[in-house]
Design a protein with these regions (language model features):
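Conserved phosphate/ATP/ADP-binding segment of small-molecule kinases
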Residues: 169-263
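Substrate-binding N-lobe of the ribokinase-like
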Residues: 6-14, 46, 50-116, 329-331
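Conserved phosphate-binding/catalytic loop of the ribokinase/pfkB sugar-kinase fold
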Residues: 108-114, 121-156
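Conserved post-catalytic alpha-helical subdomain immediately downstream of the catalytic base
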Residues: 243, 269-332
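Positively charged, low-complexity intrinsically disordered leader regions
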Residues: 1-42, 330
Length: 334
């Protein structure tokens, strides 16, 4: 497996970043609200051996598949989203915030029986103290499935690629997954998947799948490390009938398994890692925008995605990377 982190010129990078602008991508999957409560710890509670966080700031951001949308928008793309939200305050918040940042929201379907997923993280001194989740994970009705099916059909018109962002909250199920596979094949559209372990038996016939190292290990049945990496890539390709695989490995960078070429390694480009929240969303967004272009290799797409990941993990919270930040990261490393 060769190391490949120098095979992209600045001129080529900037041409790819420019070409991302205006590209249309359909995002299907699980949306949520990422809430952050930030503060400082100055004492331990007298009631229990736990830190007392003095709250200084609160913020809420679109998360999950909605964070994929934020990443696409940050690069000048034109995303549409298809997902379920609850008929609640957080569902309305998601709809409003996505519309305000420029995402088409006609594909957001409201479910009266569902609580919109909310992940709340308490952060002090750049360390996560605790996270608590509020959500409902239930099968949805035939009526809602029909609404989602219609939203997918509308959303596929005129797009350049499709991202399935599966966070295991119930939206990605067999019938809708198969519909997307059938329609993307028929329309010759690029299909990328960010997988979730619980749904591994659903997945098949994907252009690109992007598991992290833990997810890759569960897909292939053995731990993924330097010695087993090559075998893991082959196994995942076979299991999901995927044309290509990119395994994200945190501080160890990425491993790229193209359709018929030698696997490649990319070292991480992060100077410091403050927060990995949403980094996988950044990776699949950039990979889809670039790998779906004519004449672009998976190696080139992965180099750009690796630069973008290096930008976002150096920020706190659910972050995105702009074209200018990716270009600056490249120049800093040159």
């Amino acid at each position: 497996m060769k190391n490949s982190d120098k095979n992209l010129s600045l001129a080529r990078l900037e041409s790819l970043l420019e070409a991302m602008r205006g590209r249309r991508v359909l995002v299907f999957g699980d949306v949520m609200v990422d809430c952050f409560i930030r503060g400082v710890v100055e004492r331990i509670s007298p009631e229990a051996p736990v830190p007392v966080v003095s709250v200084r700031k609160r913020e809420s951001l679109p998360g999950g598949a909605a964070n994929v949308v934020r990443n696409l928008l940050a690069l000048g793309a034109r995303p549409e989203i298809v997902a379920l939200v609850g008929e609640d305050r957080h569902g309305r918040l998601l709809q409003r915030e996505l519309a305000e940042i420029g995402c088409g929201t006609k594909g957001l379907v409201a479910d009266a029986e569902r609580e919109t997923s909310v992940k709340t993280r308490v952060v002090a001194h750049r360390q996560q103290v605790v996270r608590f989740d509020q959500e409902t994970i239930l099968p949805f009705s035939a009526s809602l499935r029909d609404q989602l099916r219609q939203a997918i059909s509308r959303g596929l018109e005129g797009v350049d690629g499709v991202i399935i962002s599966d966070y295991g909250k119930g939206v990605v199920e067999e019938e809708l997954f198969n519909l997307l596979v059938t329609e993307t094949r028929r329309r010759q559209l690029f299909l990328a998947l960010d997988p979730k372990v619980a749904n591994y038996d659903l997945y098949h016939d994907i252009d690109l799948v992007t598991p992290n190292a833990d997810e890759a290990g569960q897909a292939c049945g053995f731990p993924v490390n330097d010695e087993t990496l090559a075998a893991a890539g082959v196994k995942i390709k076979e299991r999901f009938r995927s044309q290509a695989v990119v395994i994200t490995r945190g501080e160890d960078g990425m491993a790229i398994f193209p359709q018929s070429r030698t696997p490649m390694l990319l070292p991480t480009q992060a100077r410091e890692v403050f927060d990995v929240t949403g980094a996988g969303d950044t990776v699949i967004s950039v990979l889809t925008l670039t790998a779906s272009m004519a004449g672009v290799t998976l190696e080139e797409a992965a180099i750009v995605a690796n630069l973008a990941a290096g930008v976002v993990v150096g920020k706190t919270g659910t972050a995105t990377a702009s074209a200018a930040e990716i270009s600056d990261c490249y120049k800093r490393l040159s």
